[in-house]
Swiss-Prot record:
One of its GO terms (biological process) is error-free translesion synthesis. PROSITE patterns: APAG (PS51087). It comes from Serratia proteamaculans (strain 568). It comes from the Bacteria. PANTHER family: F-BOX ONLY PROTEIN 3, POLYMERASE DELTA-INTERACTING PROTEIN 2. This is Protein ApaG. Residues 1-125 form the ApaG domain.
Length: 125
């Protein structure tokens, strides 16, 4: 878990075996992110940046507006949770990045998304 001055990010990831096709180098993962506003004022998530790295070292950058079609306004003490997914060519990889956010005065800031592992269960010891 990593804390910015106002926001805490928590991540959980799982392998989605039913949608994966290992013989075609298709490994599907889902991740659930909880964004908590620990501050005294509203914050809003406007965009995201991801760096996805597979176990061969291949990196993919993803940028976009909001998350899952939303730009949530998170009140003080509140949280926003969503689930999304990633497809890798390898059974192991990582994701990390940041959210582009604004505070209650419209001032932009970034909140780091801690690096987390994407791995099929048989690779986790």
């Amino acid at each position: 878990m990593i804390d910015s001055p106002r926001v805490c990010i928590q991540v959980q990831s799982v392998y989605v075996e039913s949608q994966s096709i290992p013989e075609e180098e298709r490994y599907v993962f889902a991740y659930t992110i909880t964004i908590r506003n620990l501050g005294r004022f509203n914050v809003q998530l406007l965009g995201r940046y991801w760096l996805i790295t597979n176990s061969n070292g291949r990196q993919t950058e993803v940028q976009g507006e909001g998350v899952v079609g939303e730009q949530p306004l998170i009140p003080p003490g509140g949280e926003f949770q969503y689930t999304s997914g990633a497809i890798l060519e390898t059974p192991l990889g990582t994701m990390e990045g940041h959210y582009e956010m604004v505070d209650h005065q419209g001032q932009p800031f970034q909140t780091a998304i801690p690096v987390f592992r994407l791995a099929i269960p048989t690779l986790i010891h």
